[in-house]
Amino acid sequence: DGKPGLPGPAGPPGPPGLGGNFAAQYDGVKAPDPGPGPMGMMGARGPPGPPGPPGAQGHTGHPGEPGEPGQTGPVGPRGPPGPPGKSGEDGNNGRPGKPGDRGAPGPQGARGFPGTPGLPGMKGHRGYTGLDGRKGEPGGAGAKGEPGAHGAAGSPGLAGSRGMPGERGRAGPAGPAGARGPAGPLGAAGPPGFPGGPGPKGELGPAGATGPSGAQGSRGEPGPNGAVGPVGPPGNPGNNGLNGAKGAAGTPGVAGAPGFPGPRGGPGPQGPQGAAGQRGLAGDPGTQGVKGDGGPKGEPGNSGPQGPPGPQGEEGKRGPTGELGATGPAGNRGARGAPGSRGMPGSEGRGASGAAGPRGPPGDAGRAGESGPAGLRGLPGSPGSSGPPGKEGAAGPAGQDGRGGPPGPTGPRGPSGEAGKPGDKGATGPTGLRGAPGPDGNNGATGATGPAGGPGEKGEQGAAGAPGFQGLPGPAGGAGEAGKPGDRGLPGDQGVSGPAGAKGERGNPGAAGASGPQGPLGPRGPAGAPGTDGGKGEPGAAGAAGGPGHQGPGGMPGERGAAGGPGGKGEKGEAGHRGPDGNAGRDGSRGMPGPAGPPGPTGANGDKGESGSFGPAGPAGARGASGERGEVGPAGAPGFAGPPGADGQTGARGERGPSGGKGESGPSGPAGPAGQSGPPGASGPAGPTGARGDNGPPGLTGFPGAAGRVGAAGPAGLVGPPGSAGPAGKDGPRGLRGDPGPSGPSGDQGMVGPPGPSGEKGPSGEPGTPGTSGPLGLQGFVGLPGARGDRGSPGGAGAVGEAGRVGPAGPAGARGAPGNLGLPGMTGPQGEAGREGNPGNDGPPGRPGAPGFKGDRGEPGSSGAMGLAGAPGPAGPSGGAGRPGNRGESGPGGAAGAVGPAGARGAAGPSGPRGEKGVAGEKGERGMKGLRGHAGLQGMPGPSGPSGDTGSAGPNGPAGPRGPAGPHGPPGKDGRAGGHGTLGSPGARGPPGYVGPAGPPGXPGLPGPAGPAGGGYDVSGYDEYRAAKDYEVDATLKSLNTQLENLLTPEGSRKETCLHAHPGSLARAVVVQGSNDVELRFTFSVLEDGCTRTNKPSRLPLLDLAPLDLGGADQEFGLDLGPVCFK
């Protein structure tokens, strides 16, 4: 080897750097030229000479062009674990557990208040017609009519001899009906008639106002889980999770030159005590302390909002009859109801005879008719000759029953009984199943780099040899100076919980807190023990008059009341329908002889007289056969309600109704005695990262960690002076918190010692504070495509697509929901009489349709045969449950782990999706009666009652006044269609959409600039660190392409995105109703590629669906809205 030459000139700029992996540039080789010569042309590269000593540092070359990316270096040593990531999204709820063992029956609850009466049931089926009543007494004679006009004088005849009086002539035809006189004064009310047969079922009335809550029903079976509620507020931080899975390898670090291992340094002197750390995170909960004495009873809290209505309790015992309340004032007069359909003729009534009407105006003179019957007694006419006495007529038929009076107003509600005593404490429920662990959190950000140690003293220059094998550790060096206090270390292991403290003294009662937000509805506790019946309360003061209540059912028939006084004069009634001709009344008593009239002219000889009148009525014949059923008579007055029927059998349990609205919180009760500690709840999801606490005191020394992987060789350290290794002392007890010491100076950085023996796995440490963001790593290779993400939120509205062509006709779909009212059809021909129909079931009440156009008046059909009475329809099932949430993928079941220690109780997670129906548990013993629940909603009207028995014949009614019935009036014209209703208020804001799918990986960034030139190295020995081959990037691109194609054809193939699609079929077409109640009707077309274009701006993403007329026992309804893209 020659002697070192003088420093040569600065070399040309070095070749491009190795993409940041190797920061080294090659130095210029020492030139033998002692003087600075001119820069020559760059010669061909000679064979490498033996390595000379390093030349002096050349000037830094200009940065080269960005080089090609270097080969991947070996994997760097594993970095310190990052801070814990943010809590992941809550995992899907596990499947519902098996039903728990049945709890012991709870004690009997206190008796509830009686509920308000339900609405009157539907009208019962018509009963059989009762027997005819006995014939009534003859009515009183009517007032005398005015004299008729004089007829024209006949031609004078010869005076004949007076003949014998002829026999009475036959009755002439009835004259025209006179105008109806004003109504007479109201007669005394007759006794109530027997209950008439129920009328036919009336039209469906308008929906009544929401009734008061009914009494608490019996406890229902547990309903299925409800739909997933909105995400609740973040729970309290849960316990530390298990250690996460091993993180992915970091980006490859720069390969350092292998250094010689220095001797192991001895332990330095102990540094000054560091400043007190920030307050650490909360430790694990300690063991449960001894139960303290009960505190004094707190003051009652502020009244909370009313809670949601509890589940329906069992029916309570019937309470004792309350004292009669004071009569309430009469309600306001109701609006005039719609005319009911014409009812069947009622049995004959017993109305009182009305007063005689006033005299009508005189009629026009008619042509002479046949001899009429004897008239009622008239005013004195012009003198005529006295007629012969007439014979007695037969008695007239009995008049119809008068209508019953309306029911009296409902009396006020009686005073409430005292509330029952609170029940005993219920038994503790079973422990819930442990929830599935949440998903792993994201990786935390890289921690900040620690400060570098101060430079050591410069060592002597050694000759650079080839890297040898790693030598044994040298002797320990002397102790270095005390270093500055390092950064805050990771939290130490959690100390053992201290013993429970002594029982504290009883504290003063705190002030009543404000009402907290209403918590979620807890599970229903077991029923409390029955309270003793309270004493009868004093009657309360009469309340203010309530609004008019719903008409209650008729009461039991009362005793016959005394006759009322005459009513005031009523308004003039409309002309009634013309009644059938009555039988002739009795002849009036013989009138006084009138004064003699002037002698008339002699008449001509009369014709032969008509045959005489009929003889007296014969005896009553035998009762004839029943006549055919007449037309439906006018609706009879409501009869008195019959006695309540026997309790029916319990109906089948209906499906669970939709969840009720959230009630207001009830007032907070006084604090109850402390309950027994409940079983530990399942671990809650990890809470959000808490604020940074104060530094905790230094933790105890932990056990040695497991052996780490062999890292890449570090750079050669400086040789330290050998020191003597001291023996390791035992861990002392945990000291008290010291005062913060001053910062010590920074010590030299010692060498990495050999790996210690593998220690036992320590408990999970508490999360450290997040470090600052580390430097940006190198660009990694494109990763493989990730798993398919959750469904994204809908995109913005897209451009209108072209209309697709109509596909083939599909098979006939199931029967659709009833359509809207169509246009009126043409008048059909008169149909034939239908045969007797079977009884139909009661249909569910329909919702009012849009008003139809006025139809033409149809021809009258022939009357059909009377149908049999229909059986009461079954109770309709409850409405469908709310939409089920998206069903999560069920993970494979893991093996059952050992039971862990009870964690602190986490906050309740959000409700899971509706689970599958659990196995029915065994039938338990009947529980005691539960506490009284809130009054339930008013029930639907009950089914029609059975037909009543035939009533007995009524007593004779007095004869009604005889009046001719007018003809039927023509039907009135249909009313005009009503206007559109007002706009509804906007609905509540929907829940937030699901998290969108993860986006595709970004394109690789530009290569970074070359690093600065470093010291030169001999790289001849580094071939072993090269990567075996380049990664296959093409495979990644291909998988990305497949992933994009899958995004374009969701849930299907390229040619058909819907299963069983039938383009052009409107069997299941949707009619969308806008917020302004306008129905948007379109003819839908589905193209084969799943795209639909439209230029109608109203075809926008749906915000809400409200299906109607669903829930029948034979109906199924499903809805699936697939992914929609609006371009």
UniProtKB/Swiss-Prot annotation:
Residues 569-580, 914-928 have a biased composition (Basic and acidic residues). Residues 1-16, 260-270, 998-1010 have a biased composition (Pro residues). Residues 1-1017 are annotated as: Disordered. Signal peptide: none annotated. Disulfide bonds: none annotated. This is Collagen alpha-2(I) chain. One of its GO terms (molecular function) is extracellular matrix structural constituent. One of its GO terms (cellular component) is extracellular matrix. Residues 171-191, 221-230, 237-258, 272-282, 326-345, 355-398, 436-449, 461-473, 508-518, 611-625, 634-647, 667-692, 703-730, 758-778, 802-824, 860-872, 898-913, 937-956, 986-997 have a biased composition (Low complexity). Its main location: secreted. Keywords: Collagen, Extracellular matrix, Secreted. Belongs to the fibrillar collagen family. It holds the Pfam family Collagen. Gene3D superfamilies: 2.60.120.1000.
